[in-house]
UniProtKB/Swiss-Prot annotation:
Function: The small GTPases Rab are key regulators of intracellular membrane trafficking, from the formation of transport vesicles to their fusion with membranes. Rabs cycle between an inactive GDP-bound form and an active GTP-bound form that is able to recruit to membranes different sets of downstream effectors directly responsible for vesicle formation, movement, tethering and fusion. RAB21 is involved in membrane trafficking control. Regulates integrin internalization and recycling, but does not influence the traffic of endosomally translocated receptors in general.
Residue positions where Cysteine methyl ester is found in the record: 219
Name of the gene this protein is made from: Rab21
Record membrane topology: Lipid-anchor
EC number: 3.6.5.2
A Gene Ontology term for the protein's cellular component: cleavage furrow
NCBIfam families recorded: small_GTP
Keywords on record: Acetylation, Cell projection, Cytoplasmic vesicle, Endoplasmic reticulum, Endosome, Golgi apparatus, GTP-binding, Hydrolase, Lipoprotein, Magnesium, Membrane, Metal-binding, Methylation, Nucleotide-binding, Prenylation, Protein transport, Transport
Domain free text: Switch 1, switch 2 and the interswitch regions are characteristic of Rab GTPases and mediate the interactions with Rab downstream effectors. The switch regions undergo conformational changes upon nucleotide binding which drive interaction with specific sets of effector proteins, with most effectors only binding to GTP-bound Rab.
Organism of provenance: Mus musculus
Cofactor(s) of this protein: Mg(2+)
Descriptive protein name: Ras-related protein Rab-21
Subcellular location: Endoplasmic reticulum membrane; Golgi apparatus, trans-Golgi network; Golgi apparatus membrane; Early endosome membrane
Lipidation (S-geranylgeranyl cysteine): 218-219
Length: 222
């Protein structure tokens, strides 16, 4: 997924900073996904997020350093109006539903409509069917979910925070897509104004950032 020509070489020494927001109903496992990804932790007890929590993750993808700011939002209906505060300027959105709960899947469709209305096609969307460890209790068909994701220009993923399945793939693929989107924007704007174009999406591109400065955050990965 690297950019063609000189774009890939130009981006090789850069650090990308991306904002990712998780959206979905309460009890679908958003917090469990983030904690499993960032800290490799899982709690069988339901974790209720009040308004939002914030975690960070550092990665190296094909020689490109990526700083992720991951916003985990509350799923309760009373917090829905706060959504725009958290997804504003996001580069990626992970829309989570519980495969055993048809209603949670239908609510994802509402989030997709809202995100497309507010942010257009510039945001990378991931639709995630979580709790695949409860396959026998599934109420959302795989074909229906994947077909819907394709129809709205999103990628679909199957995950289990409990069994640690599909989560690394989800975040890695999203990061690659966000890098590709940022590089396309850079090339479209030309060398002289690439930063301005990327800034519209909230992307921060730091040239030749020393590794020693890549500290901090709740979690990190090589």
């Amino acid at each position: 997924m690297a950019a063609a020509g000189g774009g890939a070489a130009a981006a090789a020494g850069r650090a990308y900073s991306f904002k990712v927001v998780l959206l979905g109903e309460g009890c679908v496992g958003k917090t469990s996904l983030v904690l499993r990804y960032c800290e490799n932790k899982f709690n069988d007890k339901h974790i209720t997020t009040l308004q939002a929590s914030f975690l960070t993750k550092k990665l190296n993808i094909g020689g490109k350093r990526v700083n992720l700011a991951i916003w985990d939002t509350a799923g309760q209906e009373r917090f829905h109006a706060l959504g725009p505060i958290y997804y504003r300027d996001s580069n990626g959105a992970i829309l989570v539903y519980d495969v055993t709960d048809e209603d949670s899947f239908q609510k994802v469709k509402n989030w997709v409509k809202e995100l497309r209305k507010m942010l257009g096609n510039e945001i990378c969307l991931c639709i995630v069917g979580n709790k695949i460890d409860l396959e026998k209790e599934r109420h959302v068909s795989i074909q229906e979910a994947e077909s819907y994701a394709e129809s709205v220009g999103a990628k679909h993923y199957h995950t289990s925070a409990k069994q640690n399945k599909g989560i690394e793939e989800l975040f890695l693929d999203l990061c690659k897509r966000m890098i590709e989107t940022a590089q396309v924007d850079e090339r479209a704007k030309g060398n002289g104004s690439s930063q301005a174009g990327a800034a519209r999406r909230g992307v921060q591109i730091i040239d030749d950032e020393p590794q020693a400065q890549s500290s901090g955050g709740c979690c990190s990965s090589g």
